[in-house]
Swiss-Prot record:
Record's catalysed reaction(s): 8-oxo-dGTP + H2O = 8-oxo-dGMP + diphosphate + H(+)
Keyword Transport in record: no
Gene: mutX
Subunit text: Homotrimer.
One record GO biological process: DNA repair
One Pfam family from the record: NUDIX
Origin superkingdom: Bacteria
Swiss-Prot/TrEMBL keywords: DNA damage, DNA repair, DNA replication, Hydrolase, Magnesium, Metal-binding, Mutator protein
Name of the protein described by the UniProt record: 8-oxo-dGTP diphosphatase
Sequence ranges assigned to domain Nudix hydrolase in this UniProt record: 1-129
CC cofactor: Mg(2+)
Naturally occurring in which organism (per UniProt): Streptococcus pneumoniae (strain ATCC BAA-255 / R6)
Length: 154
C-alpha cells in the first residue's frame, strides 16, 4: 500500500525555509533538516495538501509549484512513499512555531551542509538549479541511500 505525501521548499530568493525535525517522538526524520509537508488526506490533491501543510507548519499562505515526484520504496516498513516535491517562491504571512521542529531560513550555500537525508542533497540541488520536472526513485536501507534513478521532462 502506498503512502502519498508532499515535501515543500519555500524559497525567498537567497534562502530556503528548512524544518529541523526535533520535536516529534518516534519521528523517522528525527534530527534531520527537511522541507515542510506531510501526508495527503483523503480526497485531497497534492496541491491542496501542500497548501494546507505549509499553512499548518509555517503560518504562510503559499502558491506551491509542483517540480517533481519521488518514489521511496519501503521507506518505512512495508510501505512505499510517493512524494510530490514542490517549490514555493510566492508566499505571504509571518512564520509561526511549528510543532514538528524548528523552522529556519537557511542560506543556499549552507543548505547542503545540514544533516538531512542523503538523497535530499540531490533533489534540493535540482530545485535550486531550476531543473525541469522530474520523476525519481530513491532506494534507502535505513539512512543509507542505495540507488537513485531520475528522468527529467522538458
Amino acid at each position: 500500500m502506498p503512502q502519498l505525501a508532499t515535501i515543500c521548499y519555500i524559497d525567498n530568493g537567497k534562502e530556503l525555509l528548512m524544518l529541523h525535525r526535533n520535536k516529534k517522538p518516534n519521528d523517522v526524520h528525527e534530527g534531520k533538516w527537511i522541507g515542510v509537508g506531510g501526508k495527503l488526506e483523503r480526497g485531497e490533491t497534492p496541491q491542496e495538501c501542500a497548501v494546507r501543510e505549509i499553512l499548518e507548519e509555517t503560518g504562510l499562505k503559499a502558491k506551491p509549484v509542483l517540480k517533481g515526484v519521488i518514489t521511496f520504496p519501503e521507506f518505512t516498513p512495508d510501505l512505499d512513499w510517493y512524494t510530490y516535491v514542490f517549490k514555493v517562491t510566492e508566499f505571504e504571512g509571518d512564520l509561526i512555531d511549528c510543532n514538528e521542529g524548528m523552522l529556519e531560513w537557511v542560506p543556499y550555500d549552507e543548505v547542503l551542509s545540514k544533516p538531512t537525508w542523503e538523497g535530499d542533497h540531490t533533489f534540493v540541488e535540482w530545485l535550486l538549479e531550476d531543473k525541469p520536472f522530474f520523476s525519481a526513485k530513491f532506494v534507502y536501507d535505513g539512512d543509507k541511500l542505495l540507488d537513485t534513478q531520475v528522468d527529467f521532462y522538458e
